[in-house]
Amino acid sequence: MGGNSTELQKILPALEKVVPVLAPGRHKGQAGKIAVIGGCREYTGAPYFAAISALKMGADLAHVFCTSGAATVIKSYSPELIVHPVLHESYDVGEIGEEEISGLKDKVLAEVGKWLQRFDCIVIGPGLGRDPILLDCVAAIIEEAKFKNIPLVLDGDGLFLVTNQPELIIGYPLAILTPNVMEHKRLVAKIVGERDQNVPQNPEVSNEDLPGQLQDLAKRMEGVTILQKGKTDYISDGKTVLSSDYYGSPRRCGGQGDVLSGSTAVFVSWAKEYFSNENAAGKKEVEERVSNNPTMVGALAGSLLCRKSAANAFAQHKRATTTTNIIEYLGHRLFTFMLRFY
């Protein structure tokens, strides 16, 4: 599903129904409030790409929660992002004991927690880094977000965190993981290889049966949706498998995964709102042609949009294509790739 013109003609009229209509009576925030948890001394571009992609797609507000070493840089990229320098890493605090770490984690959770309920979806991982104190704080944020029933999109070092601590995310149906090929292999090794005595410690991932293996992995994760990125993107929640093979761009410039994460977060927030509306038009069509699961709908829509935007950017810029060029096309492709946006 999702590649040839016949399939797209079937899918797009369904996907477009979850996109909120722009109308004079709507107020700021109704088209989506997205948060990105990520950004440290080394990595400032990734959280910016994810957050600005959400805005360019049509979300009303985008927040970034990062370390103090990343905040000023991210703020300088765009005045449209709301940046919170509340995360901490070992470099900031030096050598501290377990009691101090626990207190620091509580402080971070209090700062982030007072904002959480405002968000329609949270992206976790772009530019996060792997500092142990920082990851401990983010693990606590994930638990709090789950308690508040907020959709989560995990990418980059967010995937590193939940691959090593899968109990953080197993059984949470509003979570989307977006692994590339290598990240997917590590997930399979952790979830299947280490937990099932009937399979090898490092089970082989077969390209021939990737959809089936992905569905099995999602099922073992008890309803988590997985968007496995590759030549074809495969998406599964353990119940069914969708695919997105619309040709995008041969350029593999860094940051495209961050664009996908931000875009998917917006679509998930729209889909969740759509399915919660008992009077939403065309709900049966969306359920039959795509899925009744907002994370599946959001992941497929995000994948298709990013592929089309990347294709347009490459057609214009060729080998010079960068992630910034792809972001420029998001809003335009959202308007023209589908049908009803106003």
Curated annotation (Swiss-Prot):
SUPFAM superfamilies: Ribokinase-like (SSF53613). Keywords: ATP-binding, Lyase, NAD, NADP, Nucleotide-binding, Phosphoprotein. (6S)-NADPHX binds at residues 127, 180-186, 258. It comes from the Eukaryota. Its cofactor is Mg(2+). Its EC number is 4.2.1.93. Pfam families: Carb_kinase. Disulfide bonds: none annotated. It catalyses: (6S)-NADHX + ATP = ADP + phosphate + NADH + H(+); (6S)-NADPHX + ATP = ADP + phosphate + NADPH + H(+). GO terms for molecular function: ATP binding; ATP-dependent NAD(P)H-hydrate dehydratase activity. GO terms for biological process: metabolite repair; nicotinamide nucleotide metabolic process. ATP binds at residues 229-233, 248-257. Residues 11-337 form the YjeF C-terminal domain. Catalyzes the dehydration of the S-form of NAD(P)HX at the expense of ATP, which is converted to ADP. Together with NAD(P)HX epimerase, which catalyzes the epimerization of the S- and R-forms, the enzyme allows the repair of both epimers of NAD(P)HX, a damaged form of NAD(P)H that is a result of enzymatic or heat-dependent hydration. Belongs to the NnrD/CARKD family. This is ATP-dependent (S)-NAD(P)H-hydrate dehydratase.
